[in-house]
């Protein structure tokens, strides 16, 4: 057996964490021979609920879970971490301006970034899920200057999986038969789901999605809006935000960081834009297609970008730039 790794999940009393923790504990994220010390952080008023989650994890009797620690203290939660999954954030309440939401979250992620800087290993991998995920991730990274920027990523895998599944449903294949969809930009309704480079397996052959579907107007219209607005559609139907699908996407995202991406396949994640070849401004946390090897991601280079894509990519970059500027005003005064 390997040495145990320390994995933190914040917002651990919430419903995404409730769907995620079992996957982490049972070996389907870090592998079946990787023991885990699982650290659960939430705010003080949630500690009663968190105790219940702790009891359930104990009752799962998972062989890989060496220890489970529930806490409301950052100095306990962030100590010696190998992986931090930052799920907890201030949710958007009715009538709340996006600016107010940003302000509340800058405070949280500045504090958690500082705790990573002070207590975690410098090799820690940080995955931000709490919304607005891209800007929260950038805030945390800026607050932890001695941890490499490349170690921070945010979740756009849920959007990626949504795009995959919409194509699969339309073609009557399984989601596994669709690969190399891309989510560009922000995890918001300006994100751009791009299937210009995606492939689908039909009758044993790989075919481009545009060629397979022969329905450009759907691909440039309804497909994009369906993926962009899927989160809102789930909330409308279920009266709660996506949890099972979000937890599955987090598991996919972390597993790919840990074990690498399959040959010939790329995935989407929000990463620092420095040095990209797609004309996205530096110093943004932007979702790109990446390949991963030895726990290190690289941009997929050289994909041709048409005018339709360019416009959509620029639009979401503009939104991220505005978010960043607002967040940084708060950051300097926080």
Swiss-Prot record:
Where in the cell? Answer: Cytoplasm, Cytosol
- Asked if the record carries the keyword Acetylation, the reply is yes
Q: Which residues carry this modification: Phosphoserine?
A: 217, 241, 309, 332-333
Q: Which E.C. number(s) belong to this protein? A: 1.1.1.37, 1.1.1.96
| Catalytic residues identified in the record | 187
Gene Ontology biological process: malate metabolic process; malate-aspartate shuttle; NAD metabolic process; NADH metabolic process; NADP metabolic process; oxaloacetate metabolic process; tricarboxylic acid cycle
Residue numbers bearing the Omega-N-methylarginine modification:
230
Q: Which residues carry this modification: N6-acetyllysine?
A: 118, 121, 298
Q: Which residues carry this modification: N6-succinyllysine?
A: 110, 214, 298, 318
Q: Which UniProt keywords apply?
A: Acetylation, Cytoplasm, Methylation, NAD, Oxidoreductase, Phosphoprotein, Tricarboxylic acid cycle, Ubl conjugation
What Pfam families does the annotation carry?
Ldh_1_C, Ldh_1_N
**What is the reaction catalyzed?**
(S)-malate + NAD(+) = oxaloacetate + NADH + H(+); (2R)-2-hydroxy-3-(4-hydroxyphenyl)propanoate + NAD(+) = 3-(4-hydroxyphenyl)pyruvate + NADH + H(+); (S)-2-hydroxyglutarate + NAD(+) = 2-oxoglutarate + NADH + H(+)
Binding site residues for NAD(+):
11-17, 42, 105, 112, 129-131
Question: Can you tell me which family this protein belongs to?
Answer: Belongs to the LDH/MDH superfamily. MDH type 2 family.
The annotated subunit structure for this chain is: Homodimer.
In terms of NCBIfam families, this protein maps to: MalateDH-SF1 (TIGR01759), MDH_euk_cyt (TIGR01758), PRK05442.1 (NF003916)
Q: What does this protein do?
A: Catalyzes the reduction of aromatic alpha-keto acids in the presence of NADH. Plays essential roles in the malate-aspartate shuttle and the tricarboxylic acid cycle, important in mitochondrial NADH supply for oxidative phosphorylation. Catalyzes the reduction of 2-oxoglutarate to 2-hydroxyglutarate, leading to elevated reactive oxygen species (ROS).
Q: What name appears for this protein in its UniProt entry?
A: Malate dehydrogenase, cytoplasmic
List the source organism. Answer: Rattus norvegicus (Rat)
Instruction: State which gene encodes it.
Output: Mdh1
């Amino acid at each position: 057996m390997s040495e145990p790794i320390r994995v933190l999940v914040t917002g651990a009393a919430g419903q995404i964490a409730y769907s995620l923790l079992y996957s982490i504990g049972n070996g389907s994220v870090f592998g079946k021979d990787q023991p885990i010390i699982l650290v659960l952080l939430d705010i003080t008023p949630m500690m009663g609920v968190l105790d219940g989650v702790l009891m359930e994890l104990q009752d799962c009797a998972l062989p890989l879970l060496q220890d489970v620690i529930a806490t409301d203290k950052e100095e306990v939660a962030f100590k010696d971490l190998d992986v931090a999954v930052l799920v907890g954030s201030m949710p958007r309440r009715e009538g709340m301006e996006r600016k107010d939401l940003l302000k509340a979250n800058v405070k949280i992620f500045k504090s958690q970034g500082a705790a990573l800087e002070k207590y975690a290993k410098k090799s820690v991998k940080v995955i931000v899920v709490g919304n607005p995920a891209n800007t929260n991730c950038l805030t945390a990274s800026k607050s932890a200057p001695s941890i490499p920027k490349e170690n921070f990523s945010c979740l756009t895998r849920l959007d990626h999986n949504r795009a995959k599944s919409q194509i699969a449903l339309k073609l009557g294949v399984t989601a596994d038969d669709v690969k190399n969809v891309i989510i560009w930009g922000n995890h918001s309704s300006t994100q751009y789901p791009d299937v210009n480079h995606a492939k689908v397996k039909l009758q044993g052959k790989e075919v481009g999605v545009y060629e397979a579907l022969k329905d450009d107007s759907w691909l440039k219209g309804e497909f994009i809006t369906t993926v962009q607005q899927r989160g809102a559609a789930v909330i409308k139907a279920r009266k709660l935000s996506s949890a099972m699908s979000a937890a599955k996407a987090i598991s996919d995202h972390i597993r790919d960081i840990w074990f690498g991406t399959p040959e010939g396949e790329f995935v989407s994640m929000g990463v620092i834009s420095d040095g990209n070849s797609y004309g996205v401004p530096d110093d943004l946390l932007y979702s790109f297609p990446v390949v991963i090897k030895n726990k290190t991601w690289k941009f997929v280079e050289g994909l041709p970008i048409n005018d339709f894509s360019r416009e959509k990519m620029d639009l979401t970059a503009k939104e991220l730039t505005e978010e960043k500027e607002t967040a940084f005003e708060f950051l300097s005064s926080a």
